[in-house]
C-alpha cells in the first residue's frame, strides 16, 4: 500500500529541554494540510516524513525531513557558566573546536570562535548558559532523499533543498507549503514504486529544483572532500 508516514523524533516544547522548534506541532500542522493524501494513499510509493527540533540528538533519515537550523552562534551568560557547566566536557563536545576556556570578569567561563562555529547547538545541552535558541535566528531547513532501504538502490543520505525557512508557530505555513510543493511534483512526476530519492536520481537535481521552484544556492553544494573516503553510504560489499 502506497501510504504516507509523518513522525516527530522528539517531544519538542512539551518535554525536551533543548528544542529550537516544536516537532510535534510541525507534524500536526502538516498532517492537517495533507489529510487527503493520508486518506487516498495514492503516492507513487511510501513517503516517510520526519521532523526534528534540534540538530544533534533526535532525527533520522527520511524521504523529507524538516530540521532546525540555527543561524547565529550561542550567546553566553558568563555569570552562570562556572556554576552550571563542566567546561572541559563542553570544549570537547564542539565538533569544530570553536569553544575554549576563558576568564571573564574574573570568573571561569567559555568563549566561542565565531569564525569556526557552525551553529550546530552541540554545546547547549551540557551548558544551558550557552543559549543558541532564538525566536528570530532559529530557522527551519528541509532535506530530501534520505533512504535506509537497500531494496532497489543503495541507501542514501539526505540532501539540503531549502534553508532559512521561518520558524513560525503554531502552523508553520512556510515549511508546510514547501513540503506540499515537493509532494505534488513527486506525485505527478515519479513512476510507480519510485521513492523520492529514486525519482530525483532519475530526473537529476537541476530538474528537481526547476520543477519545485526552490532556489538553488552555493550552500546546497556538498563540497566536503573527505566524504568519499570516510563515509560508507552503502551496505553493498566492496573490495
Give the label of every model feature segment.
Residues 10, 48-55, 196-209:
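A glycine-rich phosphate-binding loop feature that marks nucleotide/adenosyl-phosphate handling sites
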Residues 147-190:
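A hydrophobic, small-residue-rich beta->alpha segment in the mid-to-C-terminal subdomain
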Residues 209-211, 215-239:
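Long C-terminal interaction/binding lobes of large macromolecular proteins
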Amino acid at each position: 500500500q502506497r501510504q504516507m508516514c509523518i513522525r516527530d523524533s522528539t517531544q519538542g516544547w512539551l518535554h525536551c529541554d533543548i528544542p529550537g522548534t516544536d516537532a510535534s506541532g510541525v507534524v500536526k500542522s502538516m498532517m492537517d494540510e495533507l489529510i487527503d493524501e493520508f486518506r487516498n494513499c495514492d503516492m507513487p510509493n511510501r513517503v516517510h516524513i520526519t521532523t526534528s527540533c534540534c540538530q544533534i540528538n533526535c532525527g533520522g533519515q527520511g524521504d523529507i525531513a524538516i530540521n532546525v537550523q540555527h543561524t547565529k552562534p550561542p550567546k553566553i551568560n558568563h555569570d552562570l557558566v562556572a556554576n552550571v557547566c563542566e567546561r572541559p566536557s563542553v570544549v570537547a563536545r564542539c565538533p569544530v573546536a570553536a569553544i575554549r576556556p576563558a576568564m571573564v570578569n574574573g570568573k571561569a567561563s567559555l568563549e566561542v570562535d565565531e569564525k569556526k562555529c557552525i551553529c550546530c547547538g552541540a554545546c547547549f545541552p551540557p551548558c544551558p548558559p550557552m543559549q543558541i535558541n532564538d525566536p528570530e535566528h532559529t530557522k527551519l531547513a528541509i532535506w530530501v532523499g534520505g533512504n535506509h532501504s537497500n531494496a532497489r538502490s543503495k541507501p542514501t543520505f539526505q540532501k539540503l533543498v531549502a534553508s532559512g525557512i521561518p520558524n513560525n508557530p503554531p502552523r508553520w505555513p512556510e515549511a508546510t507549503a514547501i513540503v506540499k510543493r515537493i509532494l505534488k511534483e513527486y506525485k505527478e512526476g515519479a513512476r510507480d514504486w519510485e521513492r523520492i530519492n529514486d525519482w530525483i536520481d532519475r530526473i537529476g537535481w537541476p530538474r528537481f529544483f526547476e520543477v519545485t521552484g526552490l532556489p538553488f544556492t552555493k550552500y546546497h553544494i556538498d563540497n566536503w572532500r573527505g566524504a568519499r573516503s570516510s563515509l560508507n553510504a552503502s551496505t553493498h560489499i566492496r573490495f
